[in-house]
Swiss-Prot record:
InterPro entries: HTH_LacI, LacI/GalR-like_sensor, Lambda_DNA-bd_dom_sf, Peripla_BP_I. Pfam families: LacI, Peripla_BP_3. It comes from Bacillus subtilis (strain 168). This is Uncharacterized HTH-type transcriptional regulator YvdE. It comes from the Bacteria. The gene is yvdE. One of its GO terms (molecular function) is DNA-binding transcription factor activity. The lineage of its organism: Bacteria, Bacillati, Bacillota, Bacilli, Bacillales.
Amino acid sequence: MATLSDVAKKANVSKMTVSRVINHPETVTDELKKLVHSAMKELNYIPNYAARALVQNRTQVVKLLILEEMDTTEPYYMNLLTGISRELDRNHYALQLVTRNSLNIGQCDGIIATGLRKNDFEGVIKAFEKPLVVFGQNEMGYDFIDVNNEKGTFMATRHVMGLGEREVVFFGIDLDEPFERAREQGYIRAMNKSFKKSNMFRIDNSSKKSECLARELLKSMDNQAAFVCASDRIALGVIRAAQSLGKRIPEDVAVTGNDGVFLDRISSPRLTTVRQPVVEMGEACAKMLLKKMNEDGAAQGSLFFEPELIVRESTL
């Protein structure tokens, strides 16, 4: 069985360097890490991470707290889980999924939280003693990862404006949260840029609700229309409403969504959407948390990912 000394000899480095690569990878260069990991792989050397955790007084467990109700019809959180677990696995950490009622079961070294609303910061989150990273923009000073929601909706609105003269309506989610306000602001900025009057509605994040509202609006519209929606789910309801009235998509009614993780690909016609790189964002959450844990809880700030406008048949 290979030893740490064997790895050091194979990589032509000191035992101290091998130990640093294993126990404190953030303190060594990528070149050194690659060299040592290559030697470990060649010698089939497996570090004792349980012993390391014991010495460092760590559990090697990170909790993912989801405070939002998960919809089994779309894999948004599965994509997030994939990204988080992928990065944690690279660093030999286990991921424990917890809810509001199971949060305090078992120990952990840090927490990633998502689906938070304003009252959660004063209640659940304020009681945390472990390093925390939030998936989703917040205004409470907590480190977070998110997509540039304002830019995404701005791009979608500008896109439908390029389809010709038509009334551009925004269907937002009825939540007074940073991500929703940012999406609304993107629409408003695009409308103002073209000196157009905003026409905004806030509804539940439900395709049934959006279908009912869109049907009533479309009945009263004489001109071509475009609906910029704050979620793919809302956009699907708009498409159904237009089709039920015999409207052509996109000739009569153009529709865009937001999220781009599943529903956009099963709609007919396929939905133009603002894609969030959720897997990559999940990886970034884990990276930020691990760095925070290694820096004794030091603040990490925020990171915004760039959205991507995926143009499909609902606006083509």
